[in-house]
Amino acid sequence: MPFAAGLWDALQRDLPLLFPQIILIVTATVMLWPGDVFVPRGDKRRWAYVTVIALLLSAFTVSGTPVGQGFNGMFQVDGITRGFQYLVLAAGVITVLLSQLQLDALGEQTVEYYALLLFSCAGMLFLVGASDLVSIYFSLELMALCIYILVAYLRTQARSIEAGVKYFLLGAFSSGILLFGISLLFAAGGGVTTNLAELNQRLALAPPSSSLLVFLGVLMVLVGFCFKVAAVPFHMWSPDAYDGAPTPITAFMSMAPKAASMAAFLRVFGTGFNGVSSDWMAPLAFVAAASMILGNVAALRQQTMKRLLAYSSIAHVGYMLLGVMAAGSPGGAQAVWLYMLTYLLMQSGAFAIVIFLQGKGEGERIDDFRGLGRTRPLLAFAMMVIMLSLAGVPPLLGFFSKFYLFKLAMEQGHVTLTVIALLTSAVAAYYYLAVVALMYFKEPAASTEAPRPMGLVTTWVVGLSCALVLLGTCFGAKLLDWAATIV
């Protein structure tokens, strides 16, 4: 049986590349059935512990996965794969922890909630290592389909349902554009392969008669990716989805999908399509500049913290796209990864504080932070550190991650974009510092309630994120070298 023997050899060779994903998929499947059948209904919260264990076990196996390609070039493990897989899994753990802070608002957290989180994380782990346009597409869909449901998880709230439907419809539209772009590139490459490395060589040698086909294909793939990271002008879904989703899912969307999509951006445009960079460099520069400008300007007018963080995340995507444009140079991928790590730390701390305040009927509006420095000085200090780091104030970790990204862009000749990034960072500092001023220079609202204890989860998430942001100030000059050991 030569076929069976060959299949067994291929599985033995290639399956170890997917051990982290296999752990998550098997765990989620067992949780849905037979686990959900035999676990009493009142014990559903134990699935949170199972989910965290699965995510940590998956993270433990990431470092042990062999470097190389598998499945006929559909998937590969390298520094980018491992580095961004760690970020995705960390975001998953943080989301499960934050979900425990909103049990009452979310209602009963059924096993499906955690299974969808695991399936979505598995899709992201596939995405960061996908080296073929077809595997990239299916990974994106596995990631997105689960998030559509999680956004609309609060079935009794019209706002959550509306956000989920909008996200799903626009997501389906963008997936169609992405798939059409892939088909055009497949045709322009001779109809032979969709592997990134091989397709890049074929597109670079394509005859002039195929130049329009190549340009349209690359442009459509770029549009599909820009939607996934909520870059301007494909950001329309982001504020409503962030505002309507359960806050832990909002935090998840701001961290994990962005990390996975940025890894795909690096692989497709930073290295995969560098042979036809003239076709996508100018459109990507426009998207990056528009994201930085519109994201920061729109954030100035927001009245709720979730929408402020939504528009802020659009601006941060613009900064990271600036790094993608320079990713072909030494240190490019490391600078983007470091920025994404810093962003994950800051977002996790900010959303933990928002969720904690929502537990007492506050935190929804920015005005709810009024006088927090007097009523909860430690929480206000942590929020101040996070806001200052998001603004890029030295010597916090956010400053160093922006510095390396902007320095790299300058060295690659993107002077105009770097100037735009610096100017829009000054705009961002205004609305971040406005939150700090509200906490320390405004009187708190009158309240007769005794201060509610922070709890173990809030203390750990906020404390750890704040401590790491502060600790980064001590190692600023060595951060990029450290990132190079991981990515």
Question: What label would you give each PLM region?
Answer:
Residues M1-V487:
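Alpha-helical transmembrane segments of multi-pass membrane proteins predominantly involved
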